Amino acid sequence: MADLCVRAPAKINLHLEVLGLRPDGFHELAMVMQSIDLADRLWLRPSADGQISLRCDQPELPTDGTNLIVRAAELLRARSGLVELGAELVLEKRIPIGAGLAGGSSNGAAALVGLNALWGLGFRAEALQAMAAELGSDMPFCLDGGTQFCFGRGERLEPLELQAPLKLALLLVKHPQVSVSTPWAYGRCQALRGDFYLQTEGEFEQRRQALRQGPLSQSLLRGLVQSTPLPPLRNDLQAVVEAEVESVRQGLALLRQAQPPLVEQPLAVAMSGSGPSLFALFPSLERAQAAHAALADELEQGGFGAWCCSFSSRGVSLER
């Protein structure tokens, strides 16, 4: 069988609200997540020896059983009952590692989709979603992608009602030497804000409904659709991380410097997920590129990597 290739896009958070703690110890979240066209590619081919092996073009990325690609492959094989199945997997890594962009989750979702096709298993989308939820909170979104409300741990998806896919773009920045532990960020959030956490499912649902239909979400949706300035993007982890991570403070300050007459003011500036990736939203890719050019010297002096990306309407997808 010929090689297969799966495209695995990154995501950003347009809204991240920490509601409280769940009985299972995870945080209950209310989010809006958005796929972007910065993507990894996962190449797959069957192996005759029944082994699952993974290689990556970035040697710092673990390729053992801790990698979500390997974990997804092993779970899919176990659920198939065909223990003789094997695969050689090669990851072309373009999404920054440890960046709050769900790169690892998207890679795991790509493995589920790619191996389901490569091995001819025929699992339906609902079954793949259930397996994705077992493996990681962001992975169900990475399967579907687009623009979605994400509730629970992030695994409960509700697509936003859009007449057409959003056409916005962004300037994304991250310091390559900095990463943020997601458990640390949530733990710190709990330490600082735990007294204000909601306690009951009824309270959680009130906040979900406010996000679905409240004035702030309607203002956010209107700005996204019309490419007009947005209300401040809420990320309850941003203040926690910004207080402790110097590069996040510096990066946010740099992105906020994108002002007339130097360049068009961004529609919004925020941190994605638990960071440390930061982004500024613009109405078009050309305007994001203009902002990048205007800030290039300062970004280089600060040691930041930068990418100009567009919103994407889909999650992981077979390319061949």
Q: Each PLM stretch: what is its role?
A:
Residues 14, 42-44, 69, 104, ...:
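Residue-level signal for inorganic ion chemistry
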Residues 85-86, 108, 112-149, 153-156:
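Contiguous, small/hydrophobic- and glycine-enriched helical/loop subdomains that border
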Residues 144, 153-268, 283-286, 293-296, ...:
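Conserved, helical-rich catalytic subdomain that frames metal- and/or nucleotide-binding sites
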